[in-house]
């Protein structure tokens, strides 16, 4: 049985969306147990009772505007902190939260702990593409500054995730840069390019420009955390703007526009589904001793269900256990 600890109080739509997502997951998957951390009365308002769902009551929670490290130190009984402690103590196998990203990164690093040999765990997310296959990108903001060695490790981590969780046999790795030529970029990008080219354990396809990302040019995209976070938010904002503009044009158009939209209804639905990140799951802080997954702050029921499904797959494939073994080998070789 896969045991998943969930911060029921994190996110804009908590606890309603969190608990209703859990209800759907419990019905869909018979091999999971959920531990919900948070206000018992509020959780029970939405929970469909099940012997595979336990509520661990706490009144304390980390707010979205709390200073992450300080909040984790001071709020020892916060729902997010208790969920992370359950993982550390072996009472749960993974943690999910839609709450304060910085705080989740802090509990991931200082409570769950990083895998030996991983210098800087990266925030990884699967981003939809027009091909429908998506790509894994990291780092998406766990680290504001990175070295070439960090980015090289992200390529290894991303490839490992793509192989073991998404089932891609030989994932193509691209380095996000301001041009495709190998001479492009700042010193960080140039140094990273050399490391990736020299590593024959990954399938490096070279530099990739931001405009190529949505076309599926690579299965894994490597970036420093600052740039990756900016690109992710740009993609999300563009997708929301496109769908919003289409809706506005259809609603404000005449009868011909509405007839045309009706004829294109199925195509527009497919387009919306392609751009919908809520079905892709959450962002994984990859490189830790257990799955620590950040669901979007505005996650709805569908997004929470998708994140639980994602974590279930991670536990089913034992991707973290395999990663520990992989880096143990690397450490022995380097020693």
Swiss-Prot record:
<dbReference type="GO" id="GO:0005737">
    <property type="term" value="C:cytoplasm"/>
</dbReference>
<comment type="subunit">
    <text>Homodimer. Probably interacts with PlsY.</text>
</comment>
<comment type="pathway">
    <text>Lipid metabolism; phospholipid metabolism.</text>
</comment>
<dbReference type="GO" id="GO:0006633">
    <property type="term" value="P:fatty acid biosynthetic process"/>
</dbReference>
<comment type="similarity">
    <text>Belongs to the PlsX family.</text>
</comment>
<protein>
    <recommendedName>
        <fullName>Phosphate acyltransferase</fullName>
        <ecNumber>2.3.1.274</ecNumber>
    </recommendedName>
</protein>
<dbReference type="InterPro" id="IPR003664">
    <property type="entry name" value="FA_synthesis"/>
</dbReference>
<keyword id="KW-0808">Transferase</keyword>
<keyword id="KW-0444">Lipid biosynthesis</keyword>
<keyword id="KW-0443">Lipid metabolism</keyword>
<dbReference type="InterPro" id="IPR012281">
    <property type="entry name" value="Phospholipid_synth_PlsX-like"/>
</dbReference>
<comment type="function">
    <text>Catalyzes the reversible formation of acyl-phosphate (acyl-PO(4)) from acyl-[acyl-carrier-protein] (acyl-ACP). This enzyme utilizes acyl-ACP as fatty acyl donor, but not acyl-CoA.</text>
</comment>
<keyword id="KW-0963">Cytoplasm</keyword>
<keyword id="KW-1208">Phospholipid metabolism</keyword>
<dbReference type="GO" id="GO:0008654">
    <property type="term" value="P:phospholipid biosynthetic process"/>
</dbReference>
<dbReference type="GO" id="GO:0043811">
    <property type="term" value="F:phosphate:acyl-[acyl carrier protein] acyltransferase activity"/>
</dbReference>
<dbReference type="Pfam" id="PF02504">
    <property type="entry name" value="FA_synthesis"/>
</dbReference>
<keyword id="KW-0594">Phospholipid biosynthesis</keyword>
